[in-house]
From Swiss-Prot:
EC top class named in words: hydrolase
Swiss-Prot/TrEMBL GO biological process terms: cell wall organization; peptidoglycan biosynthetic process; regulation of cell shape; response to antibiotic
Places the protein is found: Cell membrane
Protein function: Catalyzes the dephosphorylation of undecaprenyl diphosphate (UPP). Confers resistance to bacitracin.
Keyword Acetylation on entry: no
UniProt GO MF annotations: undecaprenyl-diphosphatase activity
Alphabetized UniProt keyword annotations: Antibiotic resistance, Cell membrane, Cell shape, Cell wall biogenesis/degradation, Hydrolase, Membrane, Peptidoglycan synthesis, Transmembrane, Transmembrane helix
InterPro entries: UppP
Segments passing through the bilayer: 2-22, 43-63, 83-103, 111-131, 161-181, 186-206, 225-245, 255-275
Catalysed reactions, as listed in the record: di-trans,octa-cis-undecaprenyl diphosphate + H2O = di-trans,octa-cis-undecaprenyl phosphate + phosphate + H(+)
Protein name: Undecaprenyl-diphosphatase
UniProt topology in membrane: Multi-pass membrane protein
Amino acid sequence: MLDIFKAIILGIIEGVTEFLPISSTGHLYLADYIIKLDQPTSFINMFMVVIQLGAILSVIVIYFNKLNPFAPSKSKREKGQTWQIWFKVIAAVLPSIIIGLPLNDWLEENMTSWQVISATLIIYGILFIVLENYYAKRQPSLTDLNKMSNKTALLIGCFQVLSMIPGTSRSGATILGAMLIGSSRYVATEFSFFLAIPTMFGASLLKLVKFFKAGHVFVGNQLAILLVGMVVSFIVAYLSIKFLLKYVQTHDFKPFGWYRIVLGIIVTICGLVFA
């Protein structure tokens, strides 16, 4: 029963942090020091990734009509624009498949230390602050997602590959990359949400396949723990997405940059004390 309660807390953390540019992985690893699940390491490692399925579903629910090319209420032109969004998403996910997939095992084995997580949290926090200072003096060249080219989408996808390093933040890397290319905060944020669907589904599926292929099965209340975490992450992520979409219309990402730096320092302290 205690693990169910811990799964609720971890689901809240995942839901809050998955789409904010502050690294869900960094938060989950930090939480693991404090409220570690009383489960085998193999299950915990799988749980930390697959729990994000709940967060992905929140994107689908919020954007179901916009991302549905078969919606009867849409005109032929609108359906065409929806297909174009999916073509851009496919273009953006290609770098993760071509570059990221072959490196996945190596990254899991060599880049999950607290040193790496704290470093990426701090580095990308600084980058967000620097970018916003630069961005404040210029107007974005891309303010409409429908006008984004497949080439631009592909470049954003290249930035997403960087997020395979724990602590980077998938949303952080893609939003940062999109803004560097010239996207408005809103377009960068929204496209990051869309790109999360195939990327996170793929990552979760890969983790599950590895889990079962290694001979593991769900025992005891493990399935319940996973499902509870996913449901909670869905609810909280839904609220987080709504918040961020409203936030970026009138605010910048500097607070998230500073937050990342502080969190990176906390992870460093925890690593030195508890590792």
